[in-house]
Amino acid sequence: MERNKIYKEDAIKFLTSVAEKSVDLAIIDPPYNMSKAEWDTFKSQNEFLKFTYHWIDALIPVLKDTGSLYIFNTPFNSAYILQYLVEKGLVFQNWVTWDKRDGFNASKNRYTHGQETILFFTRSKKYTFNADAIRIPYQSASRIESAQKKGILKNGKRWFPNPNGRLVGEVWHIASERHKNKIGGKTQKFEHLTPKPMEMIDRMVLASSNKADLVLDCFAGSGTTAVSAKKLGRNFLCADNNPQYVALANARLMEL
């Protein structure tokens, strides 16, 4: 299969065409069963889970033994997906909470929805993770400025902050595209319903792959994974069954 191309293809059919154990990193933003679009609507939760498990079964064989996998979804659906991945022998690494900063679907009957889950799994205990490549600024600038001069005492040892910032934790405070692009307080419409922030996809690509590695996305949408991979010197294999999204993704790639 030709690399660095976005295929107009159904996810499962696409995955069956990918060579076994060829993928270093898979970043998957699949349907959530939220009924907000035709591609995200299922007759029942059982039908949704059957579909989800089907593409997972097709995905696992294409991951290298050292490969990594990120899957977006709701916390509720992620609980099922996590259990299924564990049963399939993948190694759980993190349950990442993405704080979207947008307070979507505010309710007075329960806590406001403002997050999504990102499951981070690996094919085995041997995998790529470039922690230093994704460091972020320390939260307390004044405290860090003081620590850089004389250090901070932790467990009886003198600690000095890393000049490149702190390590990334399991809660990611990254504004959603709908939140970042509000005009006059109003959410703008996107060509794709749920685009993911480039900053977030870049973090995954930098952390869990190296230059020239192969990154896969079988629900490519507007092509953010492909754009990130190309920009950061990785190869990619992506697919989406919507021709409009494929055209949009290719247009974004042409701009690089």
Predicted regions and their residues:
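C-terminal helical cap(s) of enzyme catalytic domains, especially alpha/beta-barrels
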Residues: V246, N250-L256
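Core catalytic lobe of class I
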Residues: M1-L248
